[in-house]
Swiss-Prot record:
Family: Belongs to the ATPase B chain family.
Signal peptide bounds: none
SUPFAM superfamilies: F1F0 ATP synthase subunit B, membrane domain
Record keywords, A-Z: ATP synthesis, Cell inner membrane, Cell membrane, CF(0), Hydrogen ion transport, Ion transport, Membrane, Transmembrane, Transmembrane helix, Transport
Species this protein is from: Klebsiella pneumoniae (strain 342)
Protein name (Swiss-Prot/TrEMBL): ATP synthase subunit b
Length: 156
């Protein structure tokens, strides 16, 4: 193998070129690559945190929705109970009012019946007295007595 000055010059130039690249070109390239790797890593970590935050927010929203539905169900049940209670109270009040009205009407009917009986007794007594007077005034004729009694019965 013949080594001549050209090969030796090329080897020295190559070593100087490698040293120059290692000293001045390689460090900025490595710094840029490391910076880019760090940015990508931070971006991925940020995306992962954002995904976890989103999952947590969705879970919280789901929990709040469930709580709201449960509270709404409780409110609906309370409203239904209150409605039933109001209906029962209204029915009881209406029943009491009906009983009161029926009792008043029955009392009025009884009072009217009693008054009518008293009036009828007075009229019967007056008619009996009038009939007795007529019987006494007339002769004791059987046909006349029977006629007067028939008239009295018809008037009663």
């Amino acid at each position: 193998m013949n080594m001549n000055a050209t090969i030796l010059g090329q080897a020295i130039a190559f070593v100087i070129f490698v040293w120059f690249c290692m000293k001045y070109v390689w460090p900025p390239l490595m710094a840029a690559i490391e910076k880019r790797q760090k940015e990508i890593s931070d971006g991925l970590a940020s995306a992962e945190r954002a995904k976890k935050d989103l999952d947590l927010a969705q879970a919280n929203a789901t929990d709040q929705l469930k709580k709201a539905k449960a509270e709404a169900q409780v409110i609906i049940e309370q409203a239904n109970k209150r409605r039933s209670q109001i209906l029962d109270e209204a029915k009881a009040e209406a029943e009491q009012e009906r009983t009161k009205i029926v009792a008043q009407a029955q009392a009025e009917i009884d009072a009217e019946r009693k008054r009518a009986r008293e009036e009828l007794r007075k009229q019967v007594a007056i008619l009996a007295v009038a009939g007795a007077e007529k019987i006494i005034e007339r002769s004791v004729d059987e046909a006349a007595n029977s006629d007067i009694v028939d008239k009295l019965v018809a008037e009663l």
